Amino acid sequence: MMGKLRAALDARDAIGPDFVVMYRTDAIHVTGFDDALHRAKSAVEVGVDMVFVEALETREQMKRALEEIRAPLMLNLIEGGKTPLVPVQEAEAMGFKFIVPALSALFAAARGMYDVMTKIRKEGVSDGYLDKLFTFGEFAEVVRLEEIQAMEERYIPKKILEEKYHGKKHIVGH
């Protein structure tokens, strides 16, 4: 393991200071928390920039990891995962430097897609669900469609844009 880390660190040093090497250990699940700490501390000794101890199971483990690992720590928060769902502000106050609600948006999007498609399958229409949906204008604003289309006009040849939009103006504002 240390040889691979040294190779990653050499690559980081060759690339420049904006490249971060994060060490991840999943050892808790296999060999336990103490071994995960040992592995993380060994990686820090070699020179990694950040550590991610996957699946911390209690706030006590979180605190202990923060106390014993002398590097910035990442915490991922996954609904239904092993790590307690602590508010981001609490995780920051504890000392975590990189906090990732890794699947929250994906889980919410999947639930929303499932619910609306189930409604359409059962009733044939999304009516009655519209208050949970973006309007096209809201969607265009959130995904910054006007900016995307401005970049298209700047970087894509006019002929290709005409083919893409069948000679019509973009569809912003629908």
Predicted regions and their residues:
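Active-site pocket-lining/capping segments in soluble small-molecule metabolic enzymes
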Residues: 101-152
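Alpha/beta enzyme core
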Residues: 1-101, 107, 114, 118, ...
